[in-house]
């Protein structure tokens, strides 16, 4: 299945790792290195081995030239988040999942910088839908970023946004909403903001 997704990717991607000295970062490095070996369209680079604990562990999805696509995963994209991470790669590299024209137009209408944080756990079955929706929007519009956080490794964020349940969507560090959402529901929140 992975071969099919990777073979359809239109352009190569660079996966940049931001690590520190915790075992979870070593685990992320092994995980992403192994993933990178599955396709010649994925290159892996260690960007920082002494990254801040606010960032690490993190894998940023970048274009081949190192420019960020706006998609990133903070933690290890395994469990229920593995498929959504692979879809994020596919959506960033193109052609991506098919979008209805009205949805594409709404995504194009986002003109202000929109930073989305999606707080998840790897065992959450409702989180991937929101992750995929947010990443699809970010992959389509350079004004939008979608950073996914496994909150087990980011207690400060959990406390800052008073996260009692996941998924939790935070837009521009201000607008906080909880629960499963599709792409239209995410767009409604962004566009009314």
Q: Where would I find each of the regions flagged by the language model?
A:
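N-terminal leader/targeting and pre-domain segments
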Residues: 1-12, 84-111
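Local sequence-structure signature of Cys/Sec-based thiol-disulfide redox active-site neighborhoods
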Residues: 2-39, 108-142
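Thiol-based oxidoreductase modules, predominantly thioredoxin-like and allied folds used
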Residues: 20, 40-51, 142-156
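Short, surface-exposed acidic/glycine-rich loop or hinge patches that mediate macromolecular interfaces
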Residues: 22, 76, 121-124, 151-152, ...
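Structured core of small recognition/catalytic domains
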Residues: 127-193
